[in-house]
């Protein structure tokens, strides 16, 4: 699997191969296109096609040399309609100076000069030839070279340089874009030599779920050591089991702080008699009229 068609200076290190394998860049799909057969390593028993990692590294270095040959970095346009590649293309553009189109590609961006999103790049790089087919189609109209991350079942029509890799996983997409950016910076001289490690981690290119990021932010903002005392403490800000702080109204006795059942009389009848005293019904006190009709 080691690349044999490269100069010795471009040979992959053991760390590079281990990273490609750890990110599952070698795991393809169960379908295999005719144009992707030269990049096939073998087919597993479950029908999954395995990509040759050596071929992947060869195409990464080839694509990096093509990108570095363009004088103006902004003449390179990186595109990703797939969500897993949008963060990667934005980081690639930030590190290399390219233009990024993350999300939906506006039709006519390469062909209709009246639109505000019109661009004239000298090279485009797409994450998936199937999801970014509109960009590849328009590039073919205006003779723009295309570099694409291709899986075993990806269409390669109008694709000039295909980088064989798993273009459906978040880790594999991010790692290939990270390696591509690192090789471009090495060729431009931004990274002094090949022995100098790049201070940017591959994790920066990986897709992150916005909901997971929001949950992590909430967890970080929580004050450690603060314990809640129940729903009353949460709603009012006061402890649930404290003493009575409210003064009794004028003319009424203060409420007892003990159990309410202790203050109740033994029976209802005795309590009612003690509370009301002698009967004060108006029917009993009114004089009776004895005169008849």
Curated annotation (Swiss-Prot):
Record's keyword annotation contains Ribonucleoprotein: yes
UniProt keywords, alphabetically: Cytoplasm, Ribonucleoprotein, Ribosomal protein
CDD domains: RPS2 (cd01425)
SUPFAM superfamilies recorded: Ribosomal protein S2
Main location: cytoplasm
InterPro entries: Ribosomal_uS2, Ribosomal_uS2_CS, Ribosomal_uS2_euk, Ribosomal_uS2_euk/arc, Ribosomal_uS2_flav_dom_sf
GO biological process per UniProt: ribosomal small subunit assembly; translation
Low complexity compositional bias, start-end: 247-256
Job description of the protein: Required for the assembly and/or stability of the 40S ribosomal subunit. Required for the processing of the 20S rRNA-precursor to mature 18S rRNA in a late step of the maturation of 40S ribosomal subunits.
PANTHER family: 40S RIBOSOMAL PROTEIN SA
Family in the record: Belongs to the universal ribosomal protein uS2 family.
NCBIfam families: uS2_euk_arch
Record text on subunit structure and interactions: Component of the small ribosomal subunit. Mature ribosomes consist of a small (40S) and a large (60S) subunit. The 40S subunit contains about 33 different proteins and 1 molecule of RNA (18S). The 60S subunit contains about 49 different proteins and 3 molecules of RNA (25S, 5.8S and 5S). Interacts with RPS21.
Protein known as: Small ribosomal subunit protein uS2
